[in-house]
Amino acid sequence: MNDFERSVDFSHRYLDVLSLRQSVISDNIANIDTPNFKRSKISFESELEKAFLNEDKNDLNLIKSSDKHLSGFKNLKYSDVKPHRVLDHFSTMNNNGNNVDIDSEVKALVQNQMMYHLMTNVQAHYFKSINIVLK
């Protein structure tokens, strides 16, 4: 996969993650008054960073004398990184057991919308470049 294809693929995947995050944040806000509701968030960037940092390193292939032995370390590719929904069980904001803080959710919502807008502009730039080359 060349750099251009990889960039388009990455931005497309990241737009999907941002869309999922938007849904989770909206769900948190919608349940702000629900007793014992625990907020969720999407975890993605930290694992993606690990995949990018380890991308150029060689896999560690070990020779096993038994099937019960551990196998070698395989580097995770960025395309294999999946977003995970994480529940926050450890904090409580309200007396009813709900832990949704409207200020932090609105802040996360705005940040997510700005990132989504940025990534759609990046996608548009990629395809404008293709259009210019094809003319």
From Swiss-Prot:
Keyword Phosphoprotein annotated: no
Keywords: Bacterial flagellum
Domain of life the protein comes from: Bacteria
Compartment(s) where it occurs, according to its Swiss-Prot or TrEMBL record: Bacterial flagellum basal body
Database matches in Pfam families: Flg_bb_rod (PF00460)
GO cellular component: bacterial-type flagellum basal body, rod
Keyword Chloroplast: no
GO biological process: bacterial-type flagellum-dependent swarming motility
Main location: other
Function: Structural component of flagellum, the bacterial motility apparatus. Part of the rod structure of flagellar basal body.
Family to which the UniProt record says this protein belongs: Belongs to the flagella basal body rod proteins family.
Assembly with partners or alone: The basal body constitutes a major portion of the flagellar organelle and consists of a number of rings mounted on a central rod. In Gram-negative bacteria, at least four rings, L, P, S and M are present, whereas Gram-positive bacteria lack the L and P rings. The rod consists of about 26 subunits of FlgG in the distal portion, and FlgB, FlgC and FlgF build up the proximal portion of the rod with about 6 subunits each.
Name of the protein this chain belongs to: Flagellar basal body rod protein FlgB
Organism: Borreliella burgdorferi (strain ATCC 35210 / DSM 4680 / CIP 102532 / B31)
Lineage per the UniProt record: Bacteria, Pseudomonadati, Spirochaetota, Spirochaetia, Spirochaetales
